[in-house]
Amino acid sequence: MAGMFRIPIAVVQIAAFVHQIHEYLFQVQMTSGPSMMPTLNSGGEFVLLDKLHGRFARSCSVGDVVVSAKPSDSKQHVCKRIIGMPGDTIYVDPTSSNKKITIPLGHVWLAGDNIAHSLDSRNYGPVPMGLIKAKVIARVWPHPHWMSNILNDIDVE
């Protein structure tokens, strides 16, 4: 009789394990929209999210692509690149003005790679680090590859 429950118990244990991985460590998610082109195409690519680093946004750095809750609607998520970290001074919109902002503690500046088709920190300001949900670490489909940080620190003397 005890052997009869082995398989259902194993199935429940595996399901619980997979759920924990999906909820707290890694998740595959489809992207949409043109804001991250050419890094991510608008046709719906699948990316691998590292949720552990997302929960600890301080481990993220300038150039990382992250998924964040949208500041104006926390139920919606956006995929953007970190352009500035707390204390950094950046141009609000380098395409149209010389206005600068110093990013406050606990916030980051997010922007899409396709600046002409992106609603980002230029529209809603610095984003609280607590809204960062995950770091994009790889494109899964199509053309799988690890995401690399395309921004390098500039040493200004």
UniProtKB/Swiss-Prot annotation:
Q: Read off the PROSITE patterns from this record.
A: SPASE_I_2
What is this protein's record name?
Mitochondrial inner membrane protease subunit 1
Q: Name one GO cellular component term.
A: mitochondrial inner membrane peptidase complex
Report the superkingdom from the record. Eukaryota
What is the active site of this protein? S35, K80
> Which of the seven top EC classes does this enzyme belong to?
hydrolase
The family note in this entry says:
Belongs to the peptidase S26 family. IMP1 subfamily.
Major localization listed first in the record, in broad terms: mitochondrion
